UniProtKB/Swiss-Prot annotation:
Cellular component terms per the entry's GO annotation: ribonucleoprotein complex; ribosome
Role: Binds to the 23S rRNA.
GO biological process: translation
Keyword vocabulary terms for this entry: Ribonucleoprotein, Ribosomal protein, RNA-binding, rRNA-binding
Protein name per UniProt: Large ribosomal subunit protein bL9
Methyltransferase is among the record's keywords: no
Organism annotation: Francisella tularensis subsp. tularensis (strain SCHU S4 / Schu 4)
Gene Ontology MF terms in the entry: rRNA binding; structural constituent of ribosome
Membrane-crossing segments per the record: none
Family classification: Belongs to the bacterial ribosomal protein bL9 family.
A Pfam family this chain is assigned to: Ribosomal_L9_N
Keyword Amino-acid biosynthesis: no
PANTHER family on file: 50S RIBOSOMAL PROTEIN L9
């Protein structure tokens, strides 16, 4: 199925590209989430008329994402967690806890789906380097310091 992309989609294309995708991917993800429209002659003409407006909106979203990334990057965020002897945590610190800590300590809204933990969840106290994927092609490297919570 051919679709016209209304925004940049990772591993697929950028705004205005006409790409071939599987019908289920188009019907269940791209079209319902407003990322693409079916590539009919009428939609192609309508898209050409809207292209400048969509590019302007995409640029605004990108600039907002860069501003968020600049505000949160290169900072250390502290998370208090229950820990036993030897610095081993009771449980773990995952993406939800990291997103909440970054949101609270920076004032910028971060979703848990934006937090990238390449080594998996954190299970001990210490300082860890993580990445926050703010937007397509916009990542911010952060440090998370997990400390033992006061009893």
């Amino acid at each position: 199925m051919q679709v016209i992309l209304k925004e940049k989609v990772e591993n697929l294309g950028v705004l205005g590209d006409i790409v071939n995708v599987k019908p289920g991917y188009a019907r269940n993800f791209l079209i319902p989430f407003g990322k693409a429209v079916q590539a009919t002659q009428a939609n192609i003409k309508a898209f050409e008329a809207q292209k400048a407006e969509l590019e302007k909106a995409e640029k605004a979203r990108f600039e907002a994402a860069v501003a968020v990334a600049d505000a949160i990057k290169d900072k250390v965020y502290t998370i208090a967690a229950q820990a036993g002897e030897g610095g081993k945590l009771f449980g773990s610190v995952g993406t939800a806890e990291v997103a909440e800590a970054v949101s609270n300590q920076s004032g910028k809204k971060i979703e848990k789906s934006q937090v990238r933990m390449p080594e998996g969840v954190i299970r001990s106290i210490g300082e860890f380097e993580l990445t926050v994927h703010v937007y397509t092609d916009v990542d911010a490297d952060i440090k998370v310091n997990v400390v033992a919570a006061e009893a």
